[in-house]
């Protein structure tokens, strides 16, 4: 019975992590919708950071439109 008390927080922690993982999937399409593009680690020159596509990719937007 003690194992159940130890496993319950672990199961809840896994469920919490799975619930938040779906948020990262829509960010890339949100970036394209804002007429931006995804770049690895830094945006090229003449662009601004307008958000994040994923952990290592930034959403970049051109300065001139």
From Swiss-Prot:
- Keywords for this protein: Antibiotic, Antimicrobial, Defensin, Disulfide bond, Fungicide, Secreted, Signal
- Asked whether the keyword Nucleotide-binding is assigned, the reply is no
Q: Name one GO molecular function term.
A: CCR6 chemokine receptor binding
Induction cue: Induced in the theca layer of the F3 stage ovarian follicle by intravenous injection of LPS. Repressed in the granulosa layer of the F3 stage ovarian follicle by intravenous injection of LPS. Expression in cultured vaginal cells is increased by LPS and S.enteritidis. Expression in the kidney and liver is not affected by intravenous injection of LPS.
Residues cleaved off as propeptide:
20-25
Pfam families reported in the protein's UniProt record: Defensin_beta
Q: Where in the cell is it found?
A: Secreted; Cytoplasmic granule
Enumerate the Gene Ontology biological process terms. cell chemotaxis; defense response; defense response to bacterium; defense response to fungus; killing of cells of another organism
Predominant subcellular localization, coarse grouping: secreted
According to its UniProt record, in which tissues is this protein expressed? Strong expression in the bone marrow, lung, testis. Moderate expression in the bursa and intestine. Low expression in the cloaca, gall bladder, brain and pancreas. Expressed in the vagina, ovarian stroma and the theca and granulosa layers of the ovarian follicle.
User: Any signal peptide, and if so, which residues?
Assistant: 1-19
Task: List the disulfide bonds in this chain.
Answer: 31-59, 38-53, 43-60
Cellular component, GO, one term: extracellular space
Q: Please indicate which superkingdom the organism of origin belongs to.
A: Eukaryota
InterPro entries to which the protein is assigned, alphabetical: Defensin_beta-like
Q: Spell out the coiled coil positions from the record.
A: none
Q: What does this protein do?
A: Has bactericidal activity. Potent activity against E.coli ML-35, L.monocytogenes EGD and C.albicans.
In which family does this protein belong, per the annotation?
Belongs to the beta-defensin family.
What protein does this entry describe? Gallinacin-1
